[in-house]
A protein has these predicted regions:
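Low-complexity, intrinsically disordered regions enriched in charged/polar residues
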Residues: 1, 10, 181-184
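Bacterial N-terminal signal peptides
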Residues: 3-15
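Flexible coil/turn and secondary-structure edge motifs
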Residues: 18-199
Length: 199
């Protein structure tokens, strides 16, 4: 009987420890657009403290947009990623620091050969604190680029999750042409510059 009591006591302690660990997590969401969402997703999936990355669309006029519509540039939606992260491990400031590294925020509605409003540089803030942090980050990083930053800073609109085949795209298609020549170099750049932020 004593052994049974000790067993249940131990199991109870383990559950409490798991609950305490979960409660100590400080989850936040960052929503960012900076060119093709495959690129941002691939990098943030390699970032420590990031719990989930979801590709999607935001900022446009069409409800429940499809990729075919967005890619034509007629919905006003941007390709974005929603990054869920534990702010106890990686801060919103650090998320933005990575964001500036892996895309060019000085080119209007364009990233490399990807051209159109759907590829615009944009930060959608979820609260006033994020807005303030983003404003400070834009001011700081403006000194690090030759041309002015054209990144939009806007309140978070409705987010529409992209089609399933767009999720974990680089992970599932590492040898696809665009992934090899565009996505992979961004991932390697991130790992080389911000080694302390890599999982």
């Amino acid at each position: 009987m004593r052994k049974l009591f000790l067993f249940f006591s131990l199991m109870g302690s383990l559950y409490l420890s798991a609950d305490a660990k979960e409660n100590n997590m400080k989850n936040e969401i960052a929503t960012l657009g900076g060119g093709c969402f495959w690129c941002l997703e691939a990098v943030f999936e390699e970032t420590r403290g990031v719990l989930e990355v979801v590709n999607g669309y935001a900022g446009g006029d069409v409800v429940n947009p499809r990729y075919e519509q967005v890619s034509m540039g007629k919905t006003n939606h941007a390709e974005v990623v929603q990054v869920t992260f534990d702010a106890n491990i990686v801060s919103y400031e650090e998320i933005l620091k990575i964001f500036w590294l892996i895309h060019d925020p000085t080119t209007l509605n364009r990233q490399g050969n990807d051209i159109g409003t759907q590829y615009r540089s944009v930060i959608f803030y979820h609260n006033i604190k994020q807005k303030e942090v983003a404003e400070a980050s834009i001011k700081l990083f403006s000194t690090k680029f030759l041309n002015p930053i054209v990144t939009q800073l806007l309140p978070m609109p409705t987010f529409y999750k992209a089609e399933d085949y767009h999720q974990d795209y680089f992970k599932n298609n590492p040898n696809q042409g665009y992934c090899s020549f565009v996505v992979a170099p961004k991932v390697e750049k991130f790992k080389g510059v911000y080694k302390d932020l890599v999982k």
